[in-house]
A protein has these predicted regions:
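Charged, helix-rich terminal subdomains or tails
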Residues: 1-167
């Protein structure tokens, strides 16, 4: 089954315009073969990016922002910098699930705002960082493509956190 999944993901990447693409999967990815379309793989919420999009938008923008503004257990949680807000894996999962549950440009903004508010630090000196994170997450959440990139970035961060915990 794994070889089949890998083959289907490869087809998704190749079907992206320009073919210089990467197809990733996680809990939000759905893919299937469309027999009416000659058996070609089709994507539904799949994380398919050109390499440039992935490097610039997912890694260079979203992951970089998360690493610079959040203390992430098992990744940078032991950092000497004290200007980041702490974010546990559980909270990141909740944010990711809310983002994945959004359809098109619609999402449950009230729940999303509540979950983001749980990041709010007690320390006054961390308020500017929290405001940046809250504002940036909201900007990304309301645009479908940006939201998809943020979900992918969160998946990478969560997987890295999981790897560090299990090591």
């Amino acid at each position: 089954r794994m070889a089949e999944v890998t083959g289907e993901l490869e087809e998704l990447a190749k079907s992206n315009p320009g073919k210089n693409s990467i197809a990733l999967f996680g809990s939000g990815t759905e893919y299937h073969r469309n027999e009416k379309n000659g058996g070609a793989a089709e994507k539904e919420n799949a994380a398919v990016y050109t390499w440039d999009e992935f490097i610039e938008k997912v890694h260079g923008e979203k992951i970089k922002f998360l690493m610079e503004h959040m203390l992430l257990d098992g990744i940078n949680g032991n950092s000497k910098r004290n200007d980041r807000i702490s974010a546990g894996k559980s909270l990141l999962y909740k944010l990711m699930n809310l983002l994945q549950g959004a359809a098109g440009d619609r999402m449950d903004l009230a729940r999303f705002a509540y979950t983001l508010a749980r990041l709010k630090p007690k320390e006054k000196e961390l308020q500017p960082c929290y405001e940046k994170v809250r504002s940036q997450f909201y900007q990304w959440a309301v645009k479908e493509e940006e939201r998809k990139e943020l979900v992918t970035a969160l998946q990478f961060i969560i997987y890295r956190m999981r790897d560090k915990e299990e090591a």
